[in-house]
Amino acid sequence: MKDPYDVVKRHYVTEKAKMLEGLSLGGGEGKKKGSFCKDPKYTFVVAGDATKPMIAEAIEAIYSNKGVKVKKVNTVCVKPQPTRIFRGKRKGRTAGFKKAIVTFVDGHSIG
């Protein structure tokens, strides 16, 4: 297996990712179906060639001191987006990357 820090690059922090983490704080009860979930979910930026089993092993190795268990891993390849640089004169693209949404077993958390 590769070094876990080569597979998982960093924690991915956006408004949508934080909202997804916050859904697990409700304990599974909510007025609407699906408004809360029991299993906590966290988002990470991973290597482009990483597979789901590799990501699960790396997350469990990195957070072994907290004793987390991975239940499920979903991956998304984010495409590069067009940008304008230098007052719109030059056109470019942002870098594409792969992100993983990791679901932990109920009761396990990294936060």
From Swiss-Prot:
One of its GO terms (molecular function) is structural constituent of ribosome. InterPro entries: Nucleotide-bd_a/b_plait_sf, Ribosomal_uL23-like, Ribosomal_uL23/eL15/eS24_sf. Keywords: Ribonucleoprotein, Ribosomal protein, RNA-binding, rRNA-binding. GO terms for cellular component: ribonucleoprotein complex; ribosome. GO terms for biological process: translation. It comes from the Bacteria. Pfam families: Ribosomal_L23 (PF00276). Coiled coil: none annotated. Part of the 50S ribosomal subunit. Contacts protein L29, and trigger factor when it is bound to the ribosome. HAMAP family: Ribosomal_uL23_B. One of the early assembly proteins it binds 23S rRNA. One of the proteins that surrounds the polypeptide exit tunnel on the outside of the ribosome. Forms the main docking site for trigger factor binding to the ribosome. Belongs to the universal ribosomal protein uL23 family. This is Large ribosomal subunit protein uL23. It comes from Chlamydia muridarum (strain MoPn / Nigg).
